[in-house]
């Protein structure tokens, strides 16, 4: 028992001081063709670390963003049906933003649903479509069913589906990664 307590404390300590990437909002655009294929753009607005005051964690989170998401395969793992993926970071309104563009063969592989190919298009707004979880509905060009039925409906004639989600509001413990990105010059 005496040996277990220090190990448990070490695990708790490591977990508590581990950084985490987050984002303020995400904007999704899916353009679909008659055959169900198309192209998508996902924009990540205000990429942040949630460990502003932890020594070295913002730098670690930034390196994770670059190495795992931008240069690495993390986004491809999050969206395995995406083809011809292009990723970039950029500055907008003094915030670090990211953008992922890709093609797809079938929009239903990205949580869209159309009942018997006749009804309206539907999208169930759950916690995430990949990178930076914990999403909440904010707006769309469709009709939102509300908190009790978190589904966006489109009448079936649209060829472009747009929606925006919120993830994390800036807070005392968060810090935008824009200054690190500017200082590193990785574009």
Question: At which residue positions do the language-model features occur?
Answer:
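Residue-level signal for secondary-structure boundary sites
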Residues: 38, 48-50, 106-110
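Positively charged n-region of N-terminal signal peptides that target proteins for export
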Residues: 1-4, 8-9
């Amino acid at each position: 028992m005496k040996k277990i307590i220090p190990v448990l404390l070490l695990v708790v300590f490591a977990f508590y001081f581990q950084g985490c990437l987050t984002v303020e909002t995400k904007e999704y655009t899916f353009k679909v063709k008659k055959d169900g294929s198309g192209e998508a753009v996902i924009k990540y607005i205000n990429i942040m670390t949630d460990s502003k005051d932890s020594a070295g964690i913002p730098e670690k989170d930034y390196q994770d963003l670059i190495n795992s998401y931008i240069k690495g395969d993390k986004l491809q793992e999050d969206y395995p049906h995406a083809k011809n993926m292009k990723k970039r970071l950029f500055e907008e309104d003094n915030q670090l933003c990211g953008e992922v563009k890709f093609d797809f063969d079938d929009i239903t592989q990205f949580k869209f649903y159309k009942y018997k190919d006749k009804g309206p298009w539907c999208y169930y707004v759950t916690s995430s479509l990949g990178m930076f979880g914990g999403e909440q509905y904010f707006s769309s060009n469709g009709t939102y069913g509300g908190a009790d039925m978190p589904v966006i409906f489109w009448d079936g004639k649209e060829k472009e589906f747009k929606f925006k989600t919120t993830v994390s509001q800036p807070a005392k413990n968060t810090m935008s990664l824009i200054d690190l990105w500017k200082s590193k010059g990785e574009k």
